[in-house]
Amino acid sequence: MRLVILEAESLGKDMDLSGFSRFGEVTVYEKTTEEECPERVREADIVICNKVRMCSRTLSGAENLKLICVTATGINNIDLDYVKRHNIAVTNVAGYSTVSVAQHTFAMYFYLAEKLRYYDDYVKNGSYAASSLFTCMDRPFTELEGKTWGIIGLGAIGRKVASIAQAFGCRVIYYSTSGAHDDPDYERVDLYRLLKDSDVVSIHAPLNEATENLMNIETFANMKRNAILINVGRGSIVNERDLCCALREGLIAGAALDVLSSEPIRSDSPLLKMADDDRLCITPHIAWASKEARTRLIGLVQKNIASYLEGGMENRVV
């Protein structure tokens, strides 16, 4: 059995991939382009990938290919019609990053809400050493307890965030982007009500026709002026140009983004024009990537392979 890992770099250089060798001969590539892919998968029985396209252009010569393991939940890189026609099984992974993403959500919130960038700079640039006062209250902050935390998309991650927000003493409300979700533990509201009532809005929804550009200049105008927006869902749910406008015009107090419409960020992104604005926090799609989450992910991929080889259907999407 020949296994090919096409994008090991996307799992992190600190991860141990030796466990895959129990399934057969393993070839590891740090990264793979579409042009490089056909030759690399030509003799593979199992391909492990993340973002590189799996389609006729990359797979047409892979006559032995039986299984594609995607190291993510989304399978947008898979040509489903092609793999079905060629009887190639596909698995994904889910649930591995719930704790990590929830943790990062609150890290980003507190970074903005407690003005940590400003106060860290205040100490390190010498202003505190030059002060005659033992403290600094230039940028007042408020307590999270008693605030309303609005969640867009109450899946596993959304529910984890909700439970943590409750532990901080927040009232939690949520908006179901599909309209089908109903959770008795939390108050469900429409989008307008969520934006009007929430001091914090965090996005944990998938990208689809209903959510693309959901947050735009019109919806920002419905938010509280002191509200903070956090997007750890999908980048294109937030219109980034409109977000910059909303921040400049004071429609909202701050925004934190871990996902962007284009990743890596484009050099001409309007967000980069606000790089020195401490009301905006951007991280490079790292919310999912705690060491524990990546270790769980690798374990799930190995479990998927073992299940497939034993005739099982663990995490099969095709």
Language-model features, listed with the residues they occupy:
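N-terminal glycine-/charge-rich "phosphate-binding" loop or analogous flexible N-terminal tail
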Residues: M1-A44
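Structural alpha-helical scaffold elements that stabilize or flank donor/cofactor-binding regions
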Residues: F20, E39-R40, T58-G61, R193-L194, ...
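Short beta->alpha connector loops at strand-helix junctions that form conserved
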Residues: E30, T71-A72, I88-V99, S176, ...
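An anion/phosphate-binding loop that grips the pyrophosphate of nucleotide cofactors and donors
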Residues: A44, A62, D197-S198, N226
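Rossmann-fold NAD(P) dinucleotide-binding segment
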Residues: R53-L65, L80-Y82, A210-L229
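Phosphate-binding beta-alpha-beta segment of Rossmann-like dinucleotide-binding domains, i.e.
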Residues: A94-T148
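Rossmann-like dinucleotide/phosphate-binding beta-alpha-beta segment
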Residues: T135-R225
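Rossmann-like dinucleotide-binding domain for NAD(H)/NADP(H)
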Residues: N226, V232-V318
